[in-house]
Each structure stands twice: as structure tokens, then as C-alpha cells.
């Protein structure tokens, strides 16, 4: 799974916004507000990956994060992207 192409990400007042552009903006009219962990996942989903790979990367990136919490975060983020039809 990976995020559909066509987003640009900008930092605004300490928050990251992923804004749909080009062809994607014809079907997705919103933007995604990303905290630091969501931005990390978003960046790592530009290429095809799995939930398991994302959990592993998240645990490696955040020293104090346990696998169960990382899995919950990944599943929540992926579910939101699926609901918005933003995954390839």
C-alpha cells in the first residue's frame, strides 16, 4: 500500500499540511493535518509498504514507543487514509 501521488506537504505554524494537487485534487478536495508521527508515516508511505514495515520503522524512529502503540497508530492512520480513498 502507498499514498496516492499528488500531495504537497507544507509546514504551517508547527503543523504539517498535506494538500492535494493536480489530478488528485479533482477527487479529493481536502487536506490532511499531520502531527509529527503522522508526517513520518506519510513520508514512509510514498513507496509501497506494509503495516508491519511501518510499525517497525516507527518503533525504530521513536525510542520510547512500544510495538503495540505503534501498531495502533499505524492502523488508525491507514484506516483514515482508506476511508478517504487515498491509498493505491
Predicted features along the sequence, with ranges:
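Long, charge-rich, low-complexity alpha-helical segments
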Residues: 30-88
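Acidic, low-complexity/disordered tracts enriched in E/D and polar residues
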Residues: 1-46
